């Protein structure tokens, strides 16, 4: 039987004012439910950077890492975190914001399918959003680069109708901006 582990590692010190201010700003900006969601994203970015350092150390020791390095970079490029011509050193520059930008919740707002992060979260949790033909109900789902164009409303959802009040408000705002 496998033992489940935590997906996150909390801060080393609980009451650092500067960190608390940054965390609060990020939680508001990305519409996170609690600090655990932020810590999970931080842990993901930290593990990617640690693996890049590990590969750099192996390469410096003279070991062949070309295959391992290529697999790792391909994975991050498919996730859309790195550009197509990125190198291993670019992984060291990744931050928690890079991970948070790939969340489904964030992508909905960036694509204009939801007005706010909270609304995007509600649409996802209530099962109104489909990615690549499958309903996804996890706001923390990391969207791959190839799936960006395949984010849409579920066809049988009331929100699929362009006349739905939640969608009409978006269209009204667009027409007001165009006429101004």
Swiss-Prot record:
GO CC terms of this entry: small ribosomal subunit
MF GO annotations: rRNA binding; structural constituent of ribosome
GO process annotations (BP): ribosomal small subunit biogenesis; translation
InterPro entries, per the entry: Ribosomal_uS4, Ribosomal_uS4_arc, Ribosomal_uS4_CS, Ribosomal_uS4_euk/arc, Ribosomal_uS4_N, S4_RNA-bd, S4_RNA-bd_sf
Segments of this protein annotated with the region Disordered: 154-180
SUPFAM superfamilies listed in its UniProt record: Alpha-L RNA-binding motif
Basic and acidic residues biased stretches: 164-174
Pfam families: S4 (PF01479)
Disulphide bridges: none
Keywords: Ribonucleoprotein, Ribosomal protein, RNA-binding, rRNA-binding
Keyword Metal-binding annotated: no
Domain S4 RNA-binding: 102-174
Function: One of the primary rRNA binding proteins, it binds directly to 16S rRNA where it nucleates assembly of the body of the 30S subunit.
Assembly behavior: Part of the 30S ribosomal subunit. Contacts protein S5. The interaction surface between S4 and S5 is involved in control of translational fidelity.
Annotated PANTHER family: 30S 40S RIBOSOMAL PROTEIN (PTHR11831), 40S RIBOSOMAL PROTEIN S9 (PTHR11831:SF5)
Family indicated by similarity: Belongs to the universal ribosomal protein uS4 family.
NCBIfam families (UniProt xref): PRK04051.1 (NF003139), uS4_arch (TIGR01018)
Protein name as catalogued: Small ribosomal subunit protein uS4
Taxonomic lineage from the root: Archaea, Nanobdellota, Candidatus Nanoarchaeia, Nanoarchaeales, Nanoarchaeaceae
């Amino acid at each position: 039987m496998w033992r489940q582990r935590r997906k996150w590692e909390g801060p080393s010190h609980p009451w650092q004012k500067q960190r608390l201010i940054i965390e609060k700003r990020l939680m508001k900006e990305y519409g996170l439910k609690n600090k655990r969601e932020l810590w999970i994203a931080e842990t993901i970015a930290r593990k990617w950077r640690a693996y890049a350092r590990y590969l750099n150390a192996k390469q410096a020791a003279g070991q062949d890492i070309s295959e391992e390095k290529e697999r790792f970079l391909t994975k991050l490029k498919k996730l859309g975190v790195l550009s197509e011509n990125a190198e291993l050193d670019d992984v060291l520059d990744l931050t928690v914001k890079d991970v948070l930008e790939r969340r489904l919740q964030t992508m909905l707002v960036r694509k204009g399918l939801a007005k706010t992060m909270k609304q995007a979260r509600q649409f996802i949790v209530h099962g109104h959003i489909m990615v690549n033909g499958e309903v996804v109900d996890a706001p923390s789902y990391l969207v791959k680069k190839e799936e960006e164009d395949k984010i849409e409303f579920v066809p049988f959802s009331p929100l699929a109708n362009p006349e739905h009040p939640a969608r009409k408000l978006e269209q009204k705002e667009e027409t007001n901006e165009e006429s101004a």
